[in-house]
Structure formats: C-alpha cells, structure tokens
C-alpha cells in the first residue's frame, strides 16, 4: 500500500511539473490572434511584442495580398552574391499576429546566404530554380553535426528553429528559393557579421582567445565587416 501511494505521489509530481512547463512551451511560437485580422499600424508608437492594429475600416483588401517577392533584387549588389527580398510584418503589415512570413532569396553563381540563425522561427523552403547546397549545423547535443544536401528546383528543405544554416549556389546559373517562417518576425543573426561587425565591437582579446588566432587575423576580419552586409 505504501509503495502504491509513493508511485501515485511521484506521478502527481511529474504531472505538476509538466503543467508548470506548459506556458513555456506555448510561448515558444508567436501568440495566437484574437481577431480575424490585425493589420499592423507601423506608425504607431505602441509596440507590445508586436504591432498595434489599424482600425478595421482603414484596412482595405490589399493587406491580404502582396506581389513583393514576384521579382528578385540585384544578386551582385553585395559581396555575398545574393539578394534577400523580405516579406515580414514590416513589409507586409497584413501578417501581423498571424505568425507567418516569407523571404525570397536570389543567388548569383557561387553566391551564398551566409551562415545565420533565425532565433524565433522554423524555416521551410523550396528551390524555384538552380541548385543550392543547403547546410545545417546541429548543437552540441549532436556533436555539432553538419547536415547538407544539394537541393534542386522543386525540392524542399526545413531548418529547425535556432540552428545555424546557410545556402550556397553550386550551379552555373542564378538560383532562387522562397522560404516561409512560423513567425511574423523570425529575426536573423548572421554569424560573421555578429562576431566581426557588432556595434560596439567585441573586444579583440575575446575573439583571439575564442578563435585561437592572433590579433592580426581578428583585426583583418573586423575590417571586412565595418560596413555591414
């Protein structure tokens, strides 16, 4: 009888602990909307984990539709050889509170979308043309395992939330992909820019120790990112 009571008590404790964690799990994605639409008022000074809503009477049908990613940008406009056309809440106010956004990325031959992280979203993508090497790096839990595949037109990929990843055009022609996120504002952390182009700069001795190189190498790398991406 005593053993049975201890078993039940242990079970109750486990359930209570799981229930305590439930709010944390729920907050792992964008909050659920409380109305059909909440077109973002980008001029409003009120921002509480999102944007204030425009009055329904001020939001026409156009907030449901966008042609922004119908065409891409100049793939030679930056040293990466790629161009990102964003379609997050800042560019498409209609997605406010809906927990979704999209990007189009165009690549020159040999162009890359450098190693980066989306801290607030999982990413799902499809290659529209060309062929892209998609690389994903796991956490220490996986021994920093590197997963990769050449993804061709019509094929898809998924990037788990928060994992470092990149895309690289391995073809001889331009390539294009469209990606979707389960957040209206997925965020992005470019690893090279974060390390060597932060404002203010990360102290050189910190990077010397972390990267196991001399100060000259660190200063050279910092000089490459003074103007951002």
Curated annotation (Swiss-Prot):
Q: Where does Mn(2+) bind?
A: 116, 118, 123, 165
One term of GO molecular function: manganese ion binding
Please list the residues annotated as glycosylated: 80, 83
Positions of the Cupin type-1 domain: 67-219
Q: Does the keyword Manganese apply?
A: yes
The entry's localization annotation reads:
Secreted, Extracellular space, Apoplast
Leader sequence segment? 1-31
Disulfide pairings: 38-53
Quote the Gene3D superfamilies the UniProt record gives.
Answer: Jelly Rolls
Does the record bear Manganese in its keywords? yes
Q: Which GO terms describe its cellular component?
A: apoplast
Alphabetical UniProt keywords: Apoplast, Disulfide bond, Glycoprotein, Manganese, Metal-binding, Secreted, Signal
Q: Which CDD domains match?
A: cupin_OxOx
Described purpose of this protein according to its UniProt entry: May play a role in plant defense. Probably has no oxalate oxidase activity even if the active site is conserved.
Q: How does it assemble?
A: Oligomer (believed to be a pentamer but probably hexamer).
Which PANTHER family does the protein's record reference?
Answer: GERMIN-LIKE PROTEIN SUBFAMILY 3 MEMBER 3 (PTHR31238)
Family per record: Belongs to the germin family.
Query: What is this protein's name?
Result: Germin-like protein 3-6
Q: What is the lineage of its organism?
A: Eukaryota, Viridiplantae, Streptophyta, Embryophyta, Tracheophyta
């Amino acid at each position: 009888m005593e053993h049975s009571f201890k078993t039940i008590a242990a079970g109750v404790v486990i359930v209570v602990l799981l229930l305590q964690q439930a709010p944390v799990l729920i907050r792992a994605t964008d909050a659920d909307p409380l109305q059909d639409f909440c077109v973002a008022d980008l001029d409003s000074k009120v921002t509480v984990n999102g944007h204030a809503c425009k009055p329904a009477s001020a939001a026409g049908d156009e907030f449901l539709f966008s042609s922004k990613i119908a065409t891409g940008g100049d793939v030679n406009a930056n040293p990466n050889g790629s161009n990102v056309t964003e379609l997050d809440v800042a560019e498409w106010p209609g997605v406010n509170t809906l927990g979704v956004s999209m990007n189009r990325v165009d690549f020159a031959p040999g162009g890359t979308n450098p190693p980066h992280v989306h801290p607030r979203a999982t990413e799902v993508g499809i290659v529209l043309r060309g062929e892209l090497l998609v690389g994903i790096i796991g956490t220490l839990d996986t021994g920093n395992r590197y997963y990769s595949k050449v993804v061709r037109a019509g094929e898809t990929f998924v990037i788990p939330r928060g994992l470092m990843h990149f895309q690289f055009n391995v073809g001889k022609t331009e390539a294009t992909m469209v990606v979707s996120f389960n957040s209206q504002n997925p965020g992005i952390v470019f690893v090279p820019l974060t390390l060597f182009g932060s404002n203010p700069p990360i102290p050189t001795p910190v990077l010397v120790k972390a990267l196991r190189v001399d100060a000259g190498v660190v200063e050279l790398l910092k000089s490459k990112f003074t103007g951002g991406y």
